Each structure stands twice: as structure tokens, then as C-alpha cells.
């Protein structure tokens, strides 16, 4: 049987797609592929990607009308949070440690809450 093997892309609506893509490229080191498009390591990259569904009334994405949230797998959560703090990025003070990794949350310039995940080694 044919099956999906991962998430091929993440698509968000934005008031200014070029500026928002540039922000993600700058803050998270994601390669800019063109105006409004970013690529991680390329199609040969491996790693776990989660495709999850939350109840409509879940507060996990933060308050407000946000209907989706990106989870970015990061290599050094503390260092990245330091960089983001220095860049003036809005950061949620909450942290979560789980058996499968550490989590933190930030907001992009358009108010989307973004989850950062450093997998457990």
C-alpha cells in the first residue's frame, strides 16, 4: 500500500510573505530558495516529522485565532533562544522538558506562535 512518508511542506498565510520568509531564514538559519520559499536540508534530509491534530478548543497554539503551528526541530535550544533574544524576538518564558526532548515557543512578526523542539539524544 502506498503511504505518506513525511510532511512535504508547511504553508502559512501571511500579510507579507517575502518579509516573513526572510525572518524565518534569518532567525532559524533556513535556506531561502526564492521569494516566499524556504528549504531545510533538502529532499535527502532525514528526521522525524510530526503531523498532529489538536481539538478545536485547544490552547496549545497560544491564545487567539491561530489555527496551525509550526514545530521546528532545532540542534541547540539554549543557544537559539539566546540568538532570538538578542534579535528582539518575542519569546514565551514557558519551557517544557519531556522524555523525547525540550520545548520552547516564540512568535513570528505576524503573531504566529512557533514551537521549538530539541530532540532528546
Which role fits each region the language model picked out?
Residues 1-12, 81-121:
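Vicinal oxygen chelate
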Residues 2-5, 11-50:
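Core segments of cupin and vicinal oxygen chelate
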Residues 24, 51-55, 115:
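Active-site-proximal beta-strand elements of phosphoester/diester hydrolases
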